[in-house]
Amino acid sequence: MSRFLSNATNRIDAKGRVSVPSAFRSVLVQRNVQELYCFQDFVFPAISVGGPDLLERFERQIAAEDPFSPDANEMSLLIHGGGVFMKLDAEGRLMVTDFIRGFTGISDEVTFVGRADHFQLWQPQAFVAAQAQARGERKLAGKRS
């Protein structure tokens, strides 16, 4: 199965790098992802990370719109203006840049969160809080699964 599942928290080293969990690196290898597309999530204080196919999916949505529409312009502003390409180093580490830190509040640890076709980088306590809120909202709505 080549999906990003589960979550893991890793410490940022003295040089500002963090090891991507091996299960996530395996998915990247299976998908032959060489370059990571990273963007500031639309809803959560997290950085969403995937391969070029993730960017292409959003660009197809923009192309389906009138190029001068507010929706197309807003989407481009978010995925192009709020996105960067990054690469893992030879040891499977990602540089935790100001782009990541400023948007997420990450300081010394990163929680990696699987989202099926991509994964996210979270500040650990923010992830725990968001997950608890999502669980609570589902419980209030009477949804079990």
Curated annotation (Swiss-Prot):
PROSITE patterns for this protein: SPOVT_ABRB
Q: Sorted alphabetically, which keywords does the UniProt record give? A: Cytoplasm, DNA-binding, Repeat, Transcription, Transcription regulation
Q: What is its main location?
A: cytoplasm
Q: Please provide an example of a Pfam family that matches this protein in its UniProt record.
A: MraZ
Identify the GO cellular component terms for this protein.
cytoplasm; nucleoid
Is Cytoplasm found in the keyword set? yes
GO terms for biological process, alphabetical: negative regulation of DNA-templated transcription initiation
The listed locations are: Cytoplasm, Nucleoid
Query: What GO molecular function annotations does the UniProt record carry, in alphabetical order?
Result: DNA-binding transcription factor activity; transcription cis-regulatory region binding
* Positions of the SpoVT-AbrB domain: 7-54, 83-126
SUPFAM superfamilies from the xrefs? AbrB/MazE/MraZ-like
InterPro entries per the record?
Answer: MraZ, MraZ_C, MraZ_dom, MraZ_N, MraZ_sf, SpoVT-AbrB_dom, SpoVT-AbrB_sf
Complex and partners: Forms oligomers.
Kindly give the HAMAP family that the UniProt entry links to this protein. MraZ (MF_01008)
Q: Which family does it belong to?
A: Belongs to the MraZ family.
Protein's name in the database:
Transcriptional regulator MraZ
